[in-house]
């Protein structure tokens, strides 16, 4: 998937969220400090770091949930935020359909629910119980709930947690496509140092402070990153690169770069144009190539 430029030459920067020298102090220590971070319209920024690095604290500052004890946080006036939390407290033993999940935070017109579910590829699951969804399907439902409110920016906290590698790849493709289709900004938070989506415009590596930032390849080759995580962290770090001209939807259809969709050949894992069929949580290896440590992995 070709990455769109977040701010073409000569274009005015449309900053949605900005943190400047922001920090949070609690119980005699700084949870995070000196955080400089911004997300522009149409830009994907990925915040990575180990557990306890302050990623969630930084995200809460960005969302105005936490007030910084130093520095500042600013939002574009009238900013609409679509938030997909790391965890959502839902009793999975109680009946709750996907379409009902969509309205837990407020009513939505039926057409908006249908459009959002279609956009994330799970329109066929509108009546399904959330307890019966796979990890990838549930994440898509949460993204649809955020997307339905037409956000200027989506903040995704560990959106691929609990999803296997093929499911992660499908969700990363979806995130990039939603950015391309809507023009929204995306702030993605992840603890996984070994998988960064190639569609990311910038990566910010956090460990109590910003230790390095830049493109995925810039970050993994920076001396600060190597000092923090060790030379062994560089080799296995996988920068996910997907060179297909299509995205696989959970219902089996194939969405192509030109916006058309097609059904897979009955009884086959190959789509009508000869492409393999990837579902959230399952992956059949038909010449998919991922790059890990600079070496292709078939």
Swiss-Prot record:
It catalyses: Zn(2+)(out) + ATP(in) + H2O(in) = Zn(2+)(in) + ADP(in) + phosphate(in) + H(+)(in). The keyword Membrane applies. PROSITE patterns: ABC_TRANSPORTER_1 (PS00211), ABC_TRANSPORTER_2 (PS50893), ZNUC (PS51298). Residues 17-232 form the ABC transporter domain. It is found in: Cell inner membrane. Gene3D superfamilies: P-loop containing nucleotide triphosphate hydrolases. GO terms for biological process: response to zinc ion. ATP binds at residues 49-56. One of its GO terms (cellular component) is plasma membrane. Keywords: ATP-binding, Cell inner membrane, Cell membrane, Ion transport, Membrane, Nucleotide-binding, Translocase, Transport, Zinc, Zinc transport. GO terms for molecular function: ABC-type zinc transporter activity; ATP binding; ATP hydrolysis activity. It is a peripheral membrane protein. Residues 276-298 have a biased composition (Basic and acidic residues). InterPro entries: AAA+_ATPase, ABC_transporter-like_ATP-bd, ABC_transporter-like_CS, Metal_Ion_Import_ABC, P-loop_NTPase. The keyword Manganese does not apply. It holds the Pfam family ABC_tran. Residues 273-298 are annotated as: Disordered. Its EC number is 7.2.2.20. Part of the ABC transporter complex ZnuABC involved in zinc import. Responsible for energy coupling to the transport system. Belongs to the ABC transporter superfamily. Zinc importer (TC 3.A.1.15.5) family. The complex is composed of two ATP-binding proteins (ZnuC), two transmembrane proteins (ZnuB) and a solute-binding protein (ZnuA). This is Zinc import ATP-binding protein ZnuC.
